[in-house]
């Protein structure tokens, strides 16, 4: 049976990406197949893989065809999480496709991935 494994994000700096994503999503960096060009991040509760990081020299796409949606349980929690992610190195994205009164915020990771 076919199943989705995990999303893989292209990054220019593996250690920086590991630091950001482990802190952002409470993940744990796996040593399995770890290298200068690859790192797997697992769920902290041991339930499996969560995210792959692949070293890439190509720039992040300004309007990628695939992105990650991260959810919170309330607008207040969303505001707290956005501030926390910005403090970790994420950046706000000047995105011109917000609907009136959006319930989401577009951020980029330290590599510019939206």
Where do the protein language model's features map onto the residues?
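Core segments of cupin and vicinal oxygen chelate
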Residues: 2, 8-50
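A short linear hydrophobic-aromatic micro-motif
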Residues: 28, 52, 91-95
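Conserved beta-strand in the GNAT
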Residues: 49-54, 106
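Residues in well-ordered beta-strands of folded domains
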Residues: 42, 52-54, 69
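Short connector loops at helix/strand junctions that flank enzyme active sites
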Residues: 46-48, 61-65
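Vicinal oxygen chelate
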Residues: 13-15, 63, 68-111
């Amino acid at each position: 049976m076919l199943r989705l494994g995990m999303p893989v994000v292209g990054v220019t700096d593996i250690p920086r990406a590991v630091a950001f994503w482990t802190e952002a999503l409470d993940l744990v960096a796996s040593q399995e197949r770890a290298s200068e060009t690859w790192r797997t991040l697992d769920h902290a509760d041991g339930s499996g893989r969560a995210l792959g990081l692949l070293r890439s020299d190509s720039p992040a796409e300004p309007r990628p065809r695939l992105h990650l949606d991260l959810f919170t349980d309330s607008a207040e929690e969303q505001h707290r999480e956005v501030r926390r992610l910005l403090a970790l190195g994420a950046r706000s994205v000047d995105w011109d496709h917000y609907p009136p009164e959006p319930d989401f915020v577009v951020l980029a990771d330290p590599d510019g991935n939206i």
